[in-house]
Design a protein with these regions (language model features):
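Membrane-proximal soluble regions of multi-pass membrane proteins
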Residues: 20-75
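Hydrophobic, lipid-facing residues on alpha-helical transmembrane segments of integral membrane proteins
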Residues: 11, 15, 19, 78-89, ...
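Functional transmembrane core segments of multi-pass inner-membrane proteins
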Residues: 107-108, 113-221, 263-266
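Long, charge-rich boundary regions
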Residues: 61, 66-143, 147
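Hydrophobic alpha-helical transmembrane segments
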Residues: 1-15, 87, 149-156, 249-266
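C-terminal ends of transmembrane helices
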Residues: 21-27, 62-70, 123-135, 177-188, ...
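Interfacial loop-to-transmembrane junctions
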Residues: 193-194, 228-252
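Transmembrane alpha-helix boundary signature
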Residues: 90-105, 155-164, 258-262
Length: 266
């Protein structure tokens, strides 16, 4: 039963991942996410339903458009598989792990699972938009803040309303202070305004500790990823989007934050 639930979660997640690909591609361009139907960006070929099956269609089409044979970006199946894996991980970590007897519904853990899925979904979309466009959309940041506050009003959210509000303030003010000092000292932005809003959104879901976790883990991951580029191009400056790293840091804290807190305070 557990394997079946995880498999269903993966399939459902990959379907949402296909939708996320539409959001990632169209929203920064100001295009409608409803119309027109998905088309090949090279030749305009209208993608048929059987050519739009998450992950599998990419494999069957061998990564090429069926009409013009131009390559389809590997990013599409990556987003679909990543989202499927994330959905399955959330279902296991926040529900199955606490409720191995799946015949009994636990409302508290269902709410936590839904919150984790929605939170991560926002981060996935924002991360890939940031990678492509070096921007983080206000609609997701502000919408995420509202969503985090709404979950905190329930007795089953990750944090209570007080912690959520403190997380928003802390996630917005501390990074802004870092941004301001860096701008004054280096005469350049070390942190984007979109990153600050993203951290406020992270704080709405997970409070102050999740903001700190996102900043710490995000900085470490970002540094490790950036080192090869820095070593190869010592005299050149590159802008590396920080949103994906903050998102990874927040996800790590969401899954392992309680363990880390116990280690730190015992």
């Amino acid at each position: 039963m557990t394997i079946l639930v995880l498999l269903i979660s993966f399939v459902l997640g990959s379907i949402f991942g296909s939708l996320f690909n539409v959001l990632i591609y169209r929203l920064p361009r100001g295009e409608s996410v409803v119309y027109p139907n998905s088309r090949c960006p090279h030749c305009g070929h209208r993608i048929k339903p059987y050519e739009n099956i998450p992950i599998l269609s990419y494999i069957f089409l061998k990564g090429k458009c069926s009409a013009c044979k131009n390559k389809i970006s590997i990013r599409y199946p990556i987003v679909e598989a990543l989202t499927g894996f994330y959905f399955s991980l959330c279902v296991y970590a926040f529900y199955i792990k606490n409720n191995p007897d799946l015949s009994i519904l636990n409302i508290k853990d269902i709410v936590k699972t839904i919150e984790a899925i929605l939170f991560g979904s926002i981060l996935i979309v924002q991360s890939f938009i940031d990678l492509d466009w070096f921007i983080l959309l206000d609609s997701f940041n502000y919408g995420g803040i509202l969503l985090g506050l709404l979950f905190s009003l329930t007795p089953y959210g990750f944090v209570d309303i007080k912690s959520s509000i403190l997380g928003i303030l802390f996630g917005g003010l501390l990074p802004f202070l870092i941004y301001y000092i860096y701008l004054k000292v280096r005469k350049m932005e070390g942190l984007g305004i979109g990153d600050i809003k993203l951290l406020a959104m992270i704080g709405a879901f997970g409070g102050v500790y999740m903001v700190l976790g996102a900043m710490f883990f995000g900085s470490v991951i970002g540094l490790l990823v950036s080192i090869p580029t820095i070593l190869k191009n010592k005299n050149m400056q590159y802008y590396i989007p920080f949103g994906p790293f903050l998102s990874m840091g927040a996800i790590l804290w969401m899954f392992f934050g309680k363990v880390i807190e116990r280690v730190l305070w015992t």
